[in-house]
Every structure is written in C-alpha cells, then in structure tokens.
Amino acid sequence: MVSLIILFRLTFAIANRVRTLMKVLVIVSFFVLTGSASADSGALSLSGAAEALCNASKRLKSVYAFVQAKTKYATEKVREFEDMVELVRLKIVRVRGNEGGNGNWTSCTGIAKFLKRVGSKVNRVKRRELKRLRYLGYSAVGAAGIAAGRLDEMINVWRRAYSSGKGDFCVGNSEHHATRNQLLNCYLSDSEKDEFISLGDMHRMERVEEMNMTRESMNELLRLTGGGGNPLERYVHSANCHLTNTRPGGGYLSENSTSRRILWGDGIISLKRSGRGFVGGTGKTRAEVLIHDVTWEEDPVNNVPVLRNAYRELRKFVNLYAYIEELAHETGAHWNWEYAQAIVNTGTHGNKSTVVVDEDSGKSFVVLGNRETVQEEKLLEEMAICGVGRADSLRRTLALLFLLF
C-alpha cells in the first residue's frame, strides 16, 4: 500500500514537471517565432553602406558645380569665336590688296566668302549647340538632384531610427548609432536640425571632372568592399532594427509578413519578404529570387532607376561639351592656318601684336579689349579698300552675318 502511495506521488510529481516543462517549451517557442524576429534584425553599417550612400549623394550634388563650370567655359569659347571673327576681319582688310598681296584675299568678295565660311561654324555653335548644352545641363542637374534626394531620404530615416540605449539602431557601428558628425558628406555638421548639404553649399562640394563621372567611378562609390559586400554591421549580432525586419511584428506589418520585397533608395537595397534582417549581401535587388534578407545592389548605375537616369543625362551633357570643345579647337586651328597663309602670300610678316595666336601664352584666341573700336577701324579699312559703293555691298553681306551672331 505504501509502495502504491509512493508510486502515485512520484507519478504526480513527474506529471507536474512535464507540464511545467511543456509550458517552458511553449514560451521559448513563442519567443523564437516572434520575439527573436526583432532580436535578429541587423543594422546598416556606418563605415560601409551609410558612408557609401553619403559619398554618392555628395558626388551627385557636385554635378551642379561641374555643369556650371563647363557651361561657362563653353560660353567663353563662343565669345572668343566672335572675337576671332572681328580680329580676322580687321587684319585681312589691313593687308592692302594691290601692295604685293593675294588679290583674292583682299578683295571684298574674298573677305565675304572667308567670313561666311568661318562665321557659319560660330553660328552653329552659338545658336544651336550652346543652347542645347544649357538645356542638357539643366536636365543633368535635375536628375542628379533627384537621385541625391532619394539617397538622403533613406539615410535620414534609417539614421534617426535609434534608441538611447546601446545596440538599438538602424545605422551604426559595433558600439553606437551613427551621428551627424560621422556622416559629413550628407549632413551639415554645424546644423542641429539634421539639415543636409544642398547645391548652394559650393564650398562643401568636391571638385569633379569627366573622370569622376564615368559609370565605373559612380559604381565604385557604392561598392561595399568590407565584409564580403554585406551592407549590415557585422560586429553586432542584433541591432534590434525593425526596418530590416519584414516578418510579422517587424517594422512594416504587425500581424502579417510583407507580400513583396521592400525597396529603399529606389532599389539600392532590397528587403526580402518575410526576412528577419540578419543575413546581408550584394546582388541584384530586383532579381526574381533574393538570397539575402538585405541585398545591396551590385550594379547601381545600371539597375537603380534614379541613378541610371542621372548618369544618362550627365553623359549627354558631357558628350556635347566634348563636341563643342573639339569644334573650337579644330576651327581655331583652321582659322589660324588660313590667316597665316594669307599673311605669307601678301608678303607681310606678323608679330605678336598681329598674329591671331599668342604662342607664348598658348591662348587659342585673342580677346579684344575694345570691340567697338576695332569694329569702327575695320569699317574704315573696308571702305578704303573697296570704295564707297563696294563697301556698301560688303557691309550688307557682313550685316547678315552679324544677324546670325
């Protein structure tokens, strides 16, 4: 009898222990399925993803200064074209046709033909190409500004998602969340309102040239080299960042998983549906199947729409600028050669005060100090060579040319 009582008590005790153990297992399972979802959520690395985004944003904003400088230079080249026309006209009419020179160059007909030929190139650059260059410049600056804004917007949301406690952040390093002073290519360091660098902050922009605007250089800014291309902070097992967590109770839906991937920065990163935000890597953010919870785009210029558009508009501007620069060089060299031949044919030897190019300074065109004085002196020379009647005909031809300018 005593043995039965003891056996009953042991059985009852074991049953209680089993029930207790089952409760513990249920609780543990609950936290594994729910609570640990947020515990796994990683954060974007400060030295990797965040700095790459800010570097790219600053480069895109620097497009404004780049376009402004190139447009100004091209405009100056056209002005030098105009000055060249004036100077060549003056110097040609000074070569007296019947004083041992080539009559074709010194006749009114020869002058008019020469100016019409070279003047048409000036008109094409000034009226068509320069106008188009300005338009393409506006488009390039606008597209680059939109792209920079998308990246800034992403940084602003993710950086501000943090708690004062250690380890609760969405952008940071192994110790703490990222501060403004750690992202100086994004934020104004002297601002207390999380203000970003704007196009007007020219002294904060980088000096860029064509070599900095290639597809390769832009992609290099956004290439993650550390951690095997992982955009997440690898020294923090859990940053408790719900922005990388797309499961129920994460940063997007309270009771359900997201049905599709989530894109940030127009696709610079992609969050897998029902991902816990723990595994990160580099790949195609718009691929049909995402391997990583958090994927960083491997080819941003091609696959991120705002960056692709910014690059495309910028290349249009750069290509047209290169064409104008080449045309200026070729036309200037051609003019100088023809003028030099004319001087040789007339037996007149030029010096530094008369030649079109100053070889010592290397300047392609002579900029006139007083355009009106030169024009008046040139007209008197034309009248002296051609006679009053013929000068009227020449002036009509030249007047048509001036209308083109």
From Swiss-Prot:
GO terms for cellular component: plasma membrane; side of membrane. Keywords: Cell membrane, Glycoprotein, GPI-anchor, Lipoprotein, Membrane, Signal. It is found in: Cell membrane. The keyword Membrane applies. Its main location: membrane. Pfam families: Trypan_glycop. Glycans are attached at residues 55, 104, 256, 351. Residues 1-50 form the signal peptide. A lipid is attached at residue 391 (GPI-anchor amidated alanine). Residues 392-405 form a propeptide. It is a lipid-anchor; GPI-anchor. It comes from the Eukaryota. This is Protein PAG1. It comes from Trypanosoma brucei brucei. The gene is PAG1.
